[in-house]
Amino acid sequence: MLVCGKGFLKCRAPGVPFFCDKRKSFFTKTKRGFHSLPLGTGVRVYFNNNLRYSSNSIEVVEKAAINMGSKEDKADNPALSSYDDAMEALSTLISRRNRGDRTPTKGNRDKLEQVVTYLKILDLEDKIKELKVIHVAGTKGKGSTCVFSEAILRNCGFRTGMFTSPHLIDVRERFRIDGLDISEEKFLQYFWECWKLLKEKAVDGLTMPPLFQFLTVLAFKIFVCEKVDVAVIEVGLGGKLDSTNVIQKPVVCGIASLGMDHMDILGNTLADIAFHKAGIFKPQIPAFTVPQLSEAMDVLQKTANNLEVPLEVVAPLEPKKLDGVTLGLSGDHQLVNAGLAVSLSRCWLQRTGNWKKIFPNESKETEIPVAFCRGLATARLHGRAQVVHDVVSDPQDSSDSMETPCGDLIFYLDGAHSPESMEACGRWFSSAVRGDKSLSTAVNGYMRHGEYGTDLNRVSKQILLFNCMEVRDPQVLLPKLVTTCASSGTHFSRALFVPSMSTYNKVISGASAIPSDTRRKDLTWQFRLQRLWEKSIQGTDAGLDHTLKPDGITALPPHDFLCGDAPQCGGPAGTPVTSSAVMPSLPLTINWLRDCVRRNPSLKLEVLVTGSLHLVGDVLRLLKR
């Protein structure tokens, strides 16, 4: 447990819980007690179990850091100023086209040829051939698969590099070395080296690369210079024409679960999407995938046959094989991703000649080595099935007493934005909120706790905080979430729809100032989401106020708005009661939720944040402040 107070970070039983099932302990026990680390040293502390695990031992090292403060407070810091300059430079590479205006990728290989040209300019074309790459594509679960694979191989003693997308708070999240985001110093070193060389060559018709292409070549630059043993590369979008597909001879390829997403670019059928994903297959290079619908599987198998690729379908990991260890990423669906990661990691070790060196006594393919279990248990990925207990205090209390988590406001964050991932999100959230309520009884969407402490009537309410991009289909996403949760006995008391805080035409850092949201925003999209929600819940939107103008909301709902009961899907007909609200801004919404639990200490709010990774990242930024 990490508690911040009086200028020190106090670590209670530092590290992670012990894995003692079946008398096996994966972590060296440490003496319980408080240990203090001075704050204000420029190091960053993430309070959400973002831990570093040494590649050479089982030692667990807390990833230290604190909020760097506002941009203004650090204006005279050369390192931070240079980092802001880098963010400004990156922002100039963002395409101004809307996603719906993108040209379909079929048959167009100009983009890959450009990436190869940029690699030549940076003298990386031949050097990246020496990288031992695991290349992963997919619709749902490719990021988790990469994280599991990286953690497994790091715990086997290898120096790891991992490139994933998108980032939630800071662009450095996309580049991990040995399980940690690359440092600002190294990021700036490699960034400016690439930037200056490419800028010098941006003549005679060769332009600077778009943002993702630049980040891709930057990742290769980092991994080559850092001399990683393994580079785990996540496809950005699709596969066949993705910027990462300049990798000609990966060690092994993986395809995570496929579904309907990015249809404006990849096509409107599952077969079209599978065609693009299978584009990362290389002749005679082993590939693994998970169980797929037949329409997708047929395309994957046909592509594999044409390229003489040995393609293996991997079953979800059986929990009993973990010997009592819990996966580091929550949700039953992660067993699918973990199974794929185990196969990818095992194949990588075998093809690089390391398997027998590290595991000379492991003869059975079905057994999972202890180092693999350790990696699976310690994998971390922000914004996917992540739980954050907010620290709520009285702003009028000026005493020096330490802030303590009151347990009244808990955020459940998952960046689900496709029908398949929304269903998985609903199952995870329902399971998570039931986890500590086994002694309680559900009453119309909330839980009454009478077994502990002096609060005999503690009320838990499930709240939805939602936004999605306009290219998504909320008519599919919202009903999928509602029905999945309802089937598990979880009903949302209220739903809150918020506008985006992210600036899509600018790359920001974790230390960037948060927008003040003083300007009124166009909330037309949020009102549409609200109408779809009310129809999903009550079959009508008659309870909504249609006189409100989309740009006219400045007020927040009364605090007792959250005290109502959860409406039941398909309930008896009658006068509908509005179970949702459109909020003017995200920062105001977070403060309003905090005010609600301050005013009612017996209220426990369990807030599911989903629909967009951008929304999840924005909430995490606000919770860090």
Curated annotation (Swiss-Prot):
It comes from the Eukaryota. Its EC number is 6.3.2.17. Mg(2+) 2 binds at residue 262. A monovalent cation. One of its GO terms (biological process) is photorespiration. It catalyses: (6S)-5,6,7,8-tetrahydrofolyl-(gamma-L-Glu)(n) + L-glutamate + ATP = (6S)-5,6,7,8-tetrahydrofolyl-(gamma-L-Glu)(n+1) + ADP + phosphate + H(+). SUPFAM superfamilies: MurD-like peptide ligases, catalytic domain, MurD-like peptide ligases, peptide-binding domain. Disruption phenotype: Vegetative phenotype does not differ visually from wild-type. No obvious defects in root development. Polyglutamylated folates still detectable, but loss of activity leads to a significant reduction (45%) in total foliar folate abundance compared to wild-type. The reduced total folate content is a result of reduced levels of 5-formyl-THF, 10-formyl and 5,10-methenyl-THF, 5-methyl-THF and THF (42, 42, 53 and 48%, respectively) compared to wild-type. The plastid and mitochondrial folate levels are also reduced by approximately 50 and 55%, respectively compared to wild-type. It is an enzyme of class 6 (ligase). Its main location: mitochondrion. Its cofactor is a monovalent cation. Gene3D superfamilies: Mur ligase, C-terminal domain, Mur-like, catalytic domain. Belongs to the folylpolyglutamate synthase family. Catalyzes conversion of folates to polyglutamate derivatives allowing concentration of folate compounds in the cell and the intracellular retention of these cofactors, which are important substrates for most of the folate-dependent enzymes that are involved in one-carbon transfer reactions involved in purine, pyrimidine and amino acid synthesis. Essential for organellar and whole-plant folate homeostasis. This is Folylpolyglutamate synthase. It comes from Arabidopsis thaliana (Mouse-ear cress). The gene is FPGS2.
